[in-house]
């Protein structure tokens, strides 16, 4: 079955090496699309405006996320997290295009893919070994020969794209608060960010 919303986010952060495992403390406010709270808040409300946290507050376990019942965290709600307005004994599990939109475009997921890519590049000098690292970190298994061939082809196509679009590469690796490794060329890091995102979007990663 597909993991619950909180488990999905935490798994992506853990694979990226971003998850803050500290226990306890006040609620935190991770990334959220701008303007959502303003649409539903009363003018005098003390939760009229959403201001994301900085630093480790962006990467704590989802259980610590500040929860406004009138406007639950958008990315978690997309994966069927409840509003908490009423008791829920069992969550539904929907399957919608918005869910892929989140895992491929939400800043939390894009940043996780980039940090996972940085780990892969630092861990291995060759494309094959980087793919093996990504597979073991996300799927907990080695890749088969056909999978390696397919992913190598994908990486080459992405690399060719970013070789001629430096602006797009630079824009991609800037997503998220954590800075990109300045020692890595933006085009190469962007290439492996896309490949890492492919791993994070596999059913094998999202379902346990």
Regions found by a protein language model. Name each.
Residues 1-129, 178-208:
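An acidic, gly/pro-interrupted, aromatic-rich
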Residues 120-193:
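C-terminal structured "cap/appendage" subdomains that terminate the fold
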